[in-house]
């Protein structure tokens, strides 16, 4: 799986970076968590502050386009983001808690 960043914008008003990216892959579509982990490693960003807003795959293509945000702090992220988006992008410790329940 290769990720290429198309656009990297710093939004100082909301205290975050906004990224447009393309994921190229072979075989099945990678999961949101796989893309999130790889993107966090590429950007040297904490995983808990990285939100993937959307990933869209064209029919029959081996690539997906996406939009992600990297916040400077968790308080601002919780203030700005909608609840369903936060549930799609859980913190690493929260995933283990949900699996145990």
Curated annotation (Swiss-Prot):
A single MF term (Gene Ontology): structural constituent of ribosome
GO cellular component, one term: ribosome
Keyword S-adenosyl-L-methionine part of the UniProt annotation: no
Statement: the UniProt record of this protein carries the keyword Nuclease: no
Keywords from the named record: Ribonucleoprotein, Ribosomal protein
Domain of life where this protein originates: Archaea
Pfam families (UniProt xref): Ribosomal_S24e
GO term, biological process aspect, one: translation
Record-linked PANTHER family: 40S RIBOSOMAL PROTEIN S24
Protein family per UniProt: Belongs to the eukaryotic ribosomal protein eS24 family.
Protein name as it appears in the record: Small ribosomal subunit protein eS24
Gene: rps24e
